[in-house]
Amino acid sequence: MDLKEISTALDQLDLSKYELIKKEEIADIHSAGLLLKHKKSGARVVVLSNDDENKVFSIGFKTPPFNDTGLQHIMEHSTLCGSRKYPVKDPFVELCKGSLNTFLNAMTYPDKTVYPVASCNLADFKNITDVYMDAVFYPNIYQREQIFKQEGWHYELDSIDSPLKYNGVVFNEMKGVYSSPDDVLSRDTFVSLFPDTAYRFESGGEPSHIPELSYEDFLAYHKKWYHPANSYIYLYGDFDVQERLDYLDNEYLKNFDANDVQIDADIAMQRPFDILKEETHYYAVTEDEPLENNTYLSYNKVVGTALDKKLYLAMQILDYVLVMAPGAKLKQALIDKGIGTDIYSSLESSVLQPVYSIVAKNAEESQKKAFVDTIEEVLRDIAKNGIDKRMALAGMNYYEFKFREADYGAYPKGLMYYLTMMDSWLYDENEPFIHVQALDTFAQLRKELDEGLFEELIQKYLLDNSHGSLIALVPKRGLEEEKAAEEAKRLETYKNSLSKEELEAIVADTAALKAYQDEPSPQEELERIPMLKLSDIEREPAKLYIDKKSIADVDVIHHNLFTNQIAYLMLAFDCKKVPDELLPYVGLLSSVLGLMDTHKHTYPELTNEININSGGISTDAAIYTDSKDFSKYTVMYEVKGKVLYEKLPFVLEMMHEIIYETKFEDEKRLREIIARIKSRMESNMTGSGHTVAMLSAMAQFSPSSYYSDILRGYQYYEFIEKADRDFDSMKEMLAENLKRTAALIFTKENLTVSFTAEDDGLELLQKPMTEFVAKLARLQEKDAVRTFRPVKEKTAYTSSSQVQYVARCGNYRKAGYEYTGALKVLKIIFSYDYLWLNVRVKGGAYGCMSGFYRNGDTYMVSYR
């Protein structure tokens, strides 16, 4: 529908229950926007009306923390554990079982808590909206203290003679969070920069402080802060706007009065410092982890406010030029001086005063001065002599392309617009739209690039700005044991202070909580959860557009879809000629291609050209199981690009250059890449250990999982760790094997193409693809023989984490079962009945999941 028509329709609304603050046509996201305030309750409401069938609702609250107990986080969990209309213990889980939602979750931020849902099905959208609205305003936390104990924390004592323990979902979740040095560093950074504001507190909760939260304070917080007068309600998509606004008023908002509460939710501005603050903190490592070259150094600056529309985007582009882009000047200067092996940055813009951080990982504490001196030396040079304008243009195009494309993977774009809007709306209730009206800002930034804008920003916010900190996060052996001992001693001291009667009361409370958790919700409560009828569901499945074509004797799978003149191209090369011993190099290629010099461009130049002229080129390895014979699988190497139709010749030219002309013999660059891969994999394993455990377990019996493990799992990490450790003795072999692997992969015989665009896009692909194929190598080489040998080993990997990640895997086909649609149902039963009840609810772990693949592989996983 035309935007004018959508906007005109909004003019016909009866808004008698609401005050219209503003109405805007937001062409950048093809939406007509309304900013409203509910007259009686004071609720703030934004409507983005458009033709997107993936409808989004969210209600959020401004929830700045005032201590480290994690009250806000525990409240987020607890509100979804039953309510007035839906008293079932876990309405969230029941919705997961029977909803067609495209998103269903809740999130706690440093200063807000949001409850977003999304669905393409209108009946489903209305159902889940109502469950969430009832949950936040009428939760069962007042009637069931067990909810607070289960989701937050409780004392656990099975008998008088047993050791006293803490347990609770949030308590265990945050132990997992604080096992990651990256998360510890982020926390230390905020404490250092905001000593006088709410941001010095951990809204998620620090494990040592979570048990300080009382049930009474918990209830008082909800009564005051979870009121419509403190709420931010969002409606997005294609629906009857009048019906939704009337629903909000009639079912909920009219029952509240803004005058009933006095909420001072304003977040204070931190007074700037006179000088840069320096602090040293510690993180835990195991006895066999090194102390040398294992320190994090973080240079942090507070940059303006989130309400500065131009600065909001300009800092993203400046970050791209300084650190994010391959070969970025500041990053390269630190690496060249040996200050860390992995340089990364973060821009936290979802707070009132955004924070920009530059981090050197795998550094030494003694390098603090050199770290700061190098950063400021590079910044002064850029401020004086000018920014790399071509790299800045590449950064602008990169972010503008992402904004226009609005492809956020598993996250609906309407959800991402809401989170972006909250970056301004939370701090100025009259300005929700400024950050989703971005195209004029991009145009302004392009204009001001030649006028010294970015040089001025560097001078003002990074060089002349003393509101900053330098954090050294230093490894410490035995720290985890110290924390565990402190917790055990605290519990033992408390236990020894109790009388026999008090101990018996805790034992009884423990048993009562477990009994509550064991008891299923009554059938009459379960039946109150709104479920879709068959009549609510489209009988016809979504159409798959798959049309097999041929260009220059190469198979092309065409997906004829509307893409707004953007072509999505994937070159998929079969790796059947790559022997087992070279398969780790297939994984390594995905981190090397496009990030090393070619015979035509340096790698920074290459990245600039790609990002200025396209939406990016990426490469990766993948494994596909045969859809008819599940014992067969194929290792593929995929080269992907997205461009406007007229740029198809360019993207194919760049792909050819990357796969054939990369200079693998550049030892210095190869060493940098391998060190960075090792660093990133170690960080990912700390935070996502369940994926490592799952793949390692399935690799014991599943050929496809075994080879996936070689390409991206723990076996790949072992390969990378050895390459990093023994680089000097392996460097020639590494370069030679990369060349050999690329030669075995990138041939015409191995190529299949996937192309997503309309027919006119396919027509424009014909000529450049024919030319590309003509330049492909031919290779007469026998197919490699795969030598998978199943083993049955129970494996454990140790780390300094306070929590465990556990996976149990098997293959149901080997047990005599076939794949049917019933396994989709069984997955829901396993995940949301058996595992949820036993692992999360009763065990206190943060997460659990299960799955069944068509080839028979199955898994059950718990984490944190």
Please provide the spans of the model-predicted regions:
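His/Glu-based metal-binding/catalytic segments typifying zinc-dependent metallopeptidases
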Residues: V46-G60, F171-D183, V261-G327, P412-E431, ...
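M16 family metallopeptidases and their MPP-like homologs
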Residues: N54-P64, D90-Y138, E145-E156, D183-S208, ...
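Extended, regular secondary-structure scaffolds
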Residues: A220-H222, Y226, Y232, V241-Q262, ...
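Non-catalytic terminal extensions that flank enzyme cores
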Residues: D2-V56
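Hydrophobic, small-residue-rich alpha-helical packing segments that form membrane-like cores
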Residues: E156-N230, Y234-E287, L291-N293, S298
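Non-catalytic, conformational "gating/processing" segments within enzyme and secreted inhibitor domains
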Residues: L219-E251, L734-M769
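Active-site His/Glu-centered metal-binding helix of metallohydrolases
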Residues: L71, M75-T79, L589
